[in-house]
Amino acid sequence: MYAIAAVDQNWGIGRDNALLFHISADMKRFRALTEGKTVLMGRKTLQSLPNGRGLPHRRNIVLTGDRDFAAENAEIVHFPVEAVFQAGEDAWIIGGESVYRRFLPLCDRVYLTKIFADGHADAFFPDLDSDPHWQVDTESEIMEDNGLRYQFVEYVPAAPEEDDLLLSEEEPPQEPPQFAPPADFSVFSGF
């Protein structure tokens, strides 16, 4: 799985169920990466899209607890495990906040547009720069669109440190339990 988002300098992704900024290059990148693919989103994200419909030229899967919810051009699922099975490993997580938090541990790569401005958000993406489980893989040059400076950044899961793989000194290796064979096998054979 992959995640894709645009974040402000505080890792904000939205306010009042709308994007914080509209940057043409970000929208083109989103389209190029997700078109023809499966996208997974929450109900509020779907409702924030034009006409509240699934994105064109994509398979849209919407995770919601509302059993009565229906939407055009979208498959509705009600459980995270159902979403994973329906979406498959090549799905793109596109929001919102709770969906990112829930599925980020399953992602192999995260594609972010980092915008160097404060969008006064009320919804946030996890701060990957402060998370030891993620590391920057690639960064574009800093670009500008209508006075907004931004950068494309890709994150990948961090490789575990060697120390993470070793037992600490307080935890000596444990010997496997030793089992003595029973002296009388008749209890096992039914005789």
What residues fall within each predicted segment?
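Acidic, low-complexity intrinsically disordered tails
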Residues: 178-186
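Flexible, gly/pro- and Lys/Arg-enriched active-site loops
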Residues: 4-38, 43-159, 164-167, 185-191
